[in-house]
Amino acid sequence: GTHSLQDSIMLREFASPHWRDQYLEPLVQGEIFPSFGMTEPDVASSDPTQLQTTAILDNGTWKINGTKWFTTGAARAAYTTVMCRTELDAPSHGAFSMIIVPTDNPGYKIVRETPVLGINGGHYEVKYDNVEVPEENLLGPRGQGFIIAQKRLGPGRIFHCMRWLGQAQRAFDLLCERMHERETFGTPLTKKQLLQKFVFDSACEIQASRHLTLDAAKRIDQGDDARIEIGLIKVVGAEMLHNVIDRAIQVHGAKGLTDDTPLSLMYRHAREARIYDGPDEVHVQSVARRILKNYENNGPGWDFGERDASLVS
């Protein structure tokens, strides 16, 4: 799934040979599952520079203390990659590192599962109580946690958008099929202009999101970090998914609210998409700031085509 793909990219680039040998091949083969610990209950997720979990290096051993939550898949994972504050005197983004913690480690304690919108989706609150791991469990250099996180989250957001496109296609099919099945006042739903607008808007939004996603993926493949393109698709893709499913539910009427179709479950998952991996508001602000920077001091502006790699992204 998405998390395994994200972790395989991260391990390949940043893990020591020992941990690549230990986890990378089993991960790719689907024999083990990963988890990722970044979000904390007492800190706003939109400002991760305030994370409080610490890792202190003492005689070649990291000692980790803190609490994470929304650690997806923690109960079945072989390991968790944990974002920890390791450079206690360093400024903001340079204060954090990524450390691998095997989930069978003493002190790694699952506190509870955290259902989301009534769904038990495998998210957990995890406490790190004097967890000790070797120094070699560090991913990449010290103080590079945010760089590594971005390397993981960037492609991961593209994977999410690809999945959302598949879900939107399913909802679109259900919407159109329902319009052919039902009639009101002697007229099929396919003849209702208002509902035809549902079809038109959904088709436009799905296709626009599809092309935005393909563009972001292409730029990643070309070595661009694609920060702007990824921010765009994270917001536009999540909104598209919500809108298409919402219209499909509306066409199904009360049936769309029941478990007789997959739409009610899809709708709840769609609402999550505007929050996880960064809330919409953070991506909107980040994208706008990066684009505007290209116009400072009579700068080159922003090219929507095959832009110069020197433009800020």
Describe the predicted segments one by one.
Residues 50, 104-134:
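Flexible, small-/acidic-enriched active-site or ligand-binding loops
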Residues 1-18, 47, 56:
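N-terminal glycine-rich flavin-associated loop
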Residues 42-46, 70-73, 89-90, 114-122:
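Short Gly/Pro-enriched turn/cap motifs at secondary-structure boundaries
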Residues 14-19, 26, 30, 57-62, ...:
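Alpha-helical interface subdomain recognition
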Residues 35, 52-54, 79-83, 98-100, ...:
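Conserved hydrophobic/aromatic beta-strand scaffold that supports enzyme active sites
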Residues 65-109:
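A short core secondary-structure module
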Residues 30-39:
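A short, Trp-centered hydrophobic/proline-enriched beta-strand micro-motif
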Residues 38-51, 57-62, 71, 101:
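Hydrophobic, small-residue-rich alpha-helical packing segments that form membrane-like cores
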